[in-house]
């Protein structure tokens, strides 16, 4: 079996960390925690880079809360923007994306382009039309 042990660390640079923070903050720029990171992006991108290079990264605790939507109680898990979401984006972009995207189902992962519910629906519809029964 092929191993991908050091694939992530070869692709990480300071510019890539800065780009990842900006990409992860898309559609979240009104949150105070995101504004704090973006106001001092050079410091946080350097900190993210050193965290990954020294293998000293630790994910923070996920916040759990409940909302009531249409009479149904839903349990929501919210991970902190820094470092959790930034590290997720970083690991996905710097090596795992090429490995994972080819192996996941269309409908199971909506975070990446050309994946998610709509692409899955088109795929299933095409499979049903092409089937012989």
Task: Name each model-derived stretch.
Residues 2-7, 92-133:
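Active-site-proximal segment of RNA-dependent polymerases
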Residues 15-18, 42, 46, 84-89, ...:
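Non-catalytic, well-ordered alpha-helical scaffold segments
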């Amino acid at each position: 079996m092929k191993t991908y042990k050091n694939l992530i660390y070869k692709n990480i640079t300071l510019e890539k960390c800065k780009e990842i923070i900006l990409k992860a903050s898309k559609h979240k720029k009104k949150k105070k925690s995101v504004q704090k990171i973006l106001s001092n992006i050079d410091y946080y991108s350097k900190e993210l880079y050193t965290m990954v290079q020294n293998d000293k990264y630790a994910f923070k605790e996920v916040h759990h809360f409940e909302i009531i939507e249409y009479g149904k109680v839903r349990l929501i898990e919210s991970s902190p923007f820094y470092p959790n979401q930034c590290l997720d984006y970083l690991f996905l972009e710097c090596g795992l994306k090429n490995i994972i995207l080819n192996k996941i189902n269309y409908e199971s992962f909506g975070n990446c382009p050309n994946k998610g519910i709509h692409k899955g629906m088109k795929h299933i519809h095409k499979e049903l039309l092409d089937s012989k029964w």
